Amino acid sequence: MSKTYIERMSIDLRPAICGLGRQWEEMVPMRDGTRLRTLFYMPDTQGPWPVLFSRTPYLKNQSIYEYQGKIFAERGYGFICQYCRGTGGSEGAWVPFQNEKIDGVDALQWLQQRDYIESIGLYGFSYVAYTQLAVLDQLPPKVKTAYIVHFGTDRYGQMYCNGLFRHDIYTPWAKDNSGTNRILPYEAALDAGLYKPHIDADRVVWNLNLPWYREWLSHPDYETPFWKNSFWEELKAIPKKINIPVYFGCGWYDHHFGGMMCTYQSLSDYAKAHSKLVIGPWVHMKELCIEGHDTTDAYVGGIHGYEGALNWMDRCLVHGEIPEREVLAYGVGQGWRKLDQWPGSSKPLRLYLSEAGLAVQADCQESVRNYTYDPTNIIRTHGAECMCYAPLSDRGSVSQPNPNVRDDVVTWLSKPLNEPIVIDGAVKIHLSVSTDAEDTAFVVRLMEVTPEGKSYNIRTTATTLRYRNGEGRADDYTPDSRVECELTMWDILWKLQTGSYIRIDISSSSFPEYNIHYNTAEAWAMQQNPVIAHQQIWMGGESGSYIELPVE
């Protein structure tokens, strides 16, 4: 039987050293007079205490916060949890992400004045991590560190992949956090993702009015005021202003992984020199998710859970330590590795798409691989790094179908490896493509095929032709013209064994990981008339398609 979230997080948790003392609630005032419901849990020892502070919109998780309050108090720490504006008994209107900066700053200033608080460590997971990231450039003196898990500061990159909206994450999340108590089953929530035009889905399918969700749908272009002249742009700049040690925790197959890597790479020199990065083999709720490999040792020592948080807080809050930089990454096929930096040092291995498969040299003559993409006959996502609500069996790295199961998926295989290779960093793809449609999508999947013939997905990425530049800026496309697409997959640390094959699949759909592209140039959320597209992948010659692996 699989463990619950609390059970997973409590693996190897140290024994209690005291009891849970006083518990109480207060309505803490913000600068505009709005009061936010705040829960307090303190040890039964003499204060003042080091305190962990969280801000959350998730009333459904109150039992988790109560458990955290108990276990942290029993180990000498206070725990304070505040509900975001308009949630969990707090006053005001709930608009996701909008008020967390100002309210977070006000809450910390209020805590700074409490004499029972000795020091503060910010503690956040997912949206709760966002509420902490939002204030890391405006901290009062008592805040000494932050423990940030599964969130990042590149919101645009989290929501869109080269013009494709990440339905599995943000469509069910919008419904579940719409201010109603009605939680839909996953498949029912995805009905909205299939509705055309999708811009009307909240009102027609859910009978709700979610203007903030429609704003997300309406801005696939980064070069707009919605992204550039808003707090989202301010959020991207915060890592450069951080001047405290921060623990960053993420999973290879968590949907916030890409955003967290952007955050980590953007840190100020001081913050990077004194922060810790931990990357594990799990999805969002810390479930292990890599088939074909035994990763149970990933939980040893509780590095992923409450014990890992306490170890970090001990160093920064109790002992007053300023840690030196640490990078700890779980290599698939290797186990935990201590690294000097991330990504590590690597050299590029280029493999060309050719008539014979993946080759170390490009074919001299140009050739083309064709397939037909029908948006009414989509591929359902099975295995992915950027999914959250799908069943666990469809997330992470899972066994894949054999090649040639579908006519609209084309496959290239390398020769069997003569020795192991380790992918260390971001795989890059150069696609040379054309289509007879006004616009279309291409989905690229990298896999390992084991000597036993089992295929496992490693990384996936995708692009539309309008957003093929990778910069969030639309480019025109003329049907039947040949264009070049530069794609970058998320980082990975993965050892391919001797005798394995490298496999690349290219298709044009992966729903609900990405929205269904209907092969028109109309804004994606307005599209409602599917068009069949005839796709070409160009190989060989001077500008044929290839992949580039960073290998140790």
Segments predicted by a language model, with ranges:
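Alpha/beta-hydrolase fold nucleophile elbow
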Residues: 115-126
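Short beta-strand/loop motif that positions the catalytic acidic residue
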Residues: 242, 248-250
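Active-site-adjacent alpha-helix of alpha/beta-hydrolase-fold enzymes
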Residues: 258-275
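Glycine-rich nucleophile elbow surrounding the catalytic serine of serine-hydrolase chemistry
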Residues: 124-134
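N-terminal cap/lid segment of alpha/beta-hydrolase-fold proteins
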Residues: 8-45, 413, 417-419, 477
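C-terminal, loop-rich substrate-recognition/catalytic regions characterized by aromatic stacking residues
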Residues: 9-10, 199, 287, 293-552
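Cap/lid segment of the alpha/beta-hydrolase catalytic domain
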Residues: 44-112, 288-298, 438, 444, ...
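Accessory cap/linker subdomain of secreted extracellular hydrolases
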Residues: 74, 137-241
